[in-house]
Amino acid sequence: AQEEEAEQNLSELSGPWRTVYIGSTNPEKIQENGPFRTYFRELVFDDEKGTVDFYFSVKRDGKWKNVHVKATKQDDGTYVADYEGQNVFKIVSLSRTHLVAHNINVDKHGQTTELTELFVKLNVEDEDLEKFWKLTEDKGIDKKNVVNFLENEDHPHPE
């Protein structure tokens, strides 16, 4: 069922998305000022081109920076993107209201970090949370290495 969900017309899911949770095998990557402590604003899916554009904010050296990353779909259904190294991004579960994803990042030092991510369009459903926590557990990420972005006080303000 998960693969069928991911095969739907993704372009219609383009629009505002927000970060709820991100888990990481390398906690430094999601700590304050970390490169993957990302606050998503928008996702733009292009089925024809096989791309997804990520628009998010990240805090670097105490200042908010708006970032745009384009990922390209591969034959195996994953997406690859350059951001803080090489990334292979897989959509694990997707609906009109949630996106649960797994990202493998290899940074410029050759360090591999696995990240689990939950993004939502509206309110977080219990079922969406269950999918995220199951993936996080399956990937061996400890709950203490997960950041809740909705409850975090320090976040970018809309422009």
Curated annotation (Swiss-Prot):
Gene3D superfamilies: 2.40.128.20. One of its GO terms (cellular component) is extracellular space. InterPro entries: Calycin, Lipocalin, Lipocalin_CS, Lipocln_cytosolic_FA-bd_dom, OBP-like. Keywords: Olfaction, Secreted, Sensory transduction, Transport. Its main location: secreted. GO terms for molecular function: odorant binding; small molecule binding. It comes from the Eukaryota. One of its GO terms (biological process) is sensory perception of smell. Pfam families: Lipocalin. It is found in: Secreted. PANTHER family: LIPOCALIN, ODORANT-BINDING PROTEIN 1A-RELATED. Homodimer. Belongs to the calycin superfamily. Lipocalin family. This protein binds a wide variety of chemical odorants. This is Odorant-binding protein. It comes from Bos taurus (Bovine).
